[in-house]
Amino acid sequence: GARSFTGGQVRILTDESHTKARIKEIDGSRIHAQLEQGNVVVVAGFQGVDEHGNITTLGRGGSDTTGVALAAALEADECQIYTDVKGVYTTDPRVVEDARLLKSITFEEMLELASLGAKVLQIRAVEFAGKYKVPLRVLSTFEEGEGTLISLEEDSEMEDPAIAGIAFERDEAKLTVTGVPDVPGIAYKVIGPVSDAGIEVDVIVQNAAEDGTNDITFTVKRAESERAFKILQDVATSLGAKEAVQDTKVCKVSLVGVRKRSPEGIPSKMVKALA
């Protein structure tokens, strides 16, 4: 038979941060008892209970994280997560038709892919699995197949690809302050006010100009670009810089998992492909 439980009933204990609670511990005894009786156990994801008995929700990625946490508590062989794709691909198969399904990938590489724009798994679930050494397998809900195994060990096939995958993020905007005085700590004076406003700064590039000044460029989420640009205009004026410039027609492309055995020239091949 089957038995269903809420997060509170199996005591998925969380902190008190409602809507974004973090899992502290899980009491697996109730689940173990049902499994020993031969029952299938169904546990509601995305929810837990705090020390005072209040129901909490785990926030973004909470359901995947619940599955990983249960697998860790039960010391399962692996945690299988079913999605709308066959597994983890070298890049988004909805954009690139000949993207290849990866048989295996390391936690580190999966974290990089997830943080750089790949949507197949939430970063939080991968971090949890890596911390507790729970092998993850991403499978399709609709098709048969072995999917992709995410683990600590790198698959050591002789014909390993040079890189694990390519991630891209369209939700980007580029901001530049030109003609910034070349003095120690100037990058912080440019970027600090943007970060202080709660805007996440991503890629940062600093270039030296011929006249002894610097150009400082960084990226933010496109939705935050207008607010960041207004802050940057004030910063440029206060620092005596030339001007602040905004560009919302950019995309971030990242090569992930450049292997130790990789042939030389990968960066040049990437630049050539984009030329």
Where are these regions (language model features)?
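A conserved regulatory-domain signal marking ACT and ACT-like small-molecule sensing domains
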Residues: 147-275
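Nucleotide/pyrophosphate-binding catalytic subdomain
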Residues: 1-126, 207, 219-221
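Acidic-aromatic/histidine active-site loop/patch
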Residues: 129
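Short hydrophobic alpha-helical runs that function as membrane-insertion/retention elements
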Residues: 78-82, 136-138, 202
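Internal glycine-rich alpha/beta core junctions
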Residues: 139-141, 145
